């Protein structure tokens, strides 16, 4: 962790700014520890201590947030962050077992917390999960906006107004129809966000360094992703081709596109409302916005 902080002092922004990323990494490491315990490749008492440590990070994230010290931008595709997580989990586990911080003969960041794993499978899986958790917040806010627009559509379903194309009078419509159209277009983008989340549910956990599962115990990839799905309640599945998935960034592009789509649609709705509320004396003033 410290070497990573010193070597990659680039943005001066720590990755602990995104709390869902810490939670997501803890879930991934917990799923891994559970799998390694079941497969008998990590001592049960060590695995249980690491599982306990992961639960601390999941349930008391703010308490340990300052322990994640690496820069957002770093070489090695996230190796510094992966080791940061391994070291935090190991030291919490060591304390839980009654040892002294840094006594890696009890719980080792490499040989225990990272057993059968690589930055190249744990880090992207954690990003996938954190993107789902964070986009859920966005979806909830968008749903509240959509519902508010639909409520106004019902309120104004009998209010006649002039419909326009290119700012020229066209044909009559109700103000309710206009509000419903805004709500519907927001709902379209909500569905696109949900569709993007489906791509994020395909992960490469257990692929290890390049997708060949080298260093992972037989059966580990399937068991680890099963654990992750059960722990989070999200239907995660491993890619059919772990080698392809290890270097693929398509899910991020799909999510980014969906977020941009929502932003563009919201901009359009905002501009419509701003124009219709223009005035108060010389503009359209068809809509009164609350002060």
Model-based region annotation:
Residues 1-291:
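Conserved, well-structured ligand/cofactor-binding cores
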């Amino acid at each position: 962790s410290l070497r990573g902080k010193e070597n990659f002092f680039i943005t001066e922004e720590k990755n602990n700014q995104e709390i869902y990323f810490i939670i997501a990494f803890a879930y991934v490491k917990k799923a891994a520890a559970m799998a390694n315990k079941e497969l008998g490749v990590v001592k049960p008492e060590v695995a249980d201590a690491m599982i306990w440590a992961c639960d601390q990070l999941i349930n008391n994230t703010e308490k340990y947030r300052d322990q994640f010290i690496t820069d957002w931008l770093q070489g090695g595709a996230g190796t510094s962050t992966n080791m940061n997580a391994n070291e935090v989990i190991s030291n919490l586990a060591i304390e839980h077992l009654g040892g002294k911080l840094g006594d890696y003969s009890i719980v080792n960041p490499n040989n225990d917390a990272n057993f059968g794993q690589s930055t190249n499978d744990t880090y992207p899986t954690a990003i996938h999960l954190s993107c789902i958790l964070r986009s859920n917040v966005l979806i909830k806010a968008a749903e509240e906006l959509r519902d508010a627009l639909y409520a106004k559509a019902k309120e104004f379903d009998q209010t006649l107004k002039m419909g326009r194309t290119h700012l020229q009078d066209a044909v009559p419509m109700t103000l309710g129809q206009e509000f419903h159209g805004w709500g519907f277009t927001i709902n379209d983008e909500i569905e696109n966000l949900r569709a993007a989340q489906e791509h994020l549910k395909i992960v490469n956990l257990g692929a290890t360094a390049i997708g060949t599962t080298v260093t992972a115990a037989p059966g580990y990839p399937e068991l680890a992703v099963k654990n992750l799905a059960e722990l989070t309640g999200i239907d995660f599945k491993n890619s059919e081709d772990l080698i392809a998935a290890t270097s693929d960034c398509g899910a991020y592009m799909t999510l980014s596109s969906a977020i941009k789509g929502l932003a563009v649609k919201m901009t359009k709705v905002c501009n419509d409302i701003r124009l219709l509320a223009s005035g108060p004396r010389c503009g359209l003033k068809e809509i009164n916005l609350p002060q």
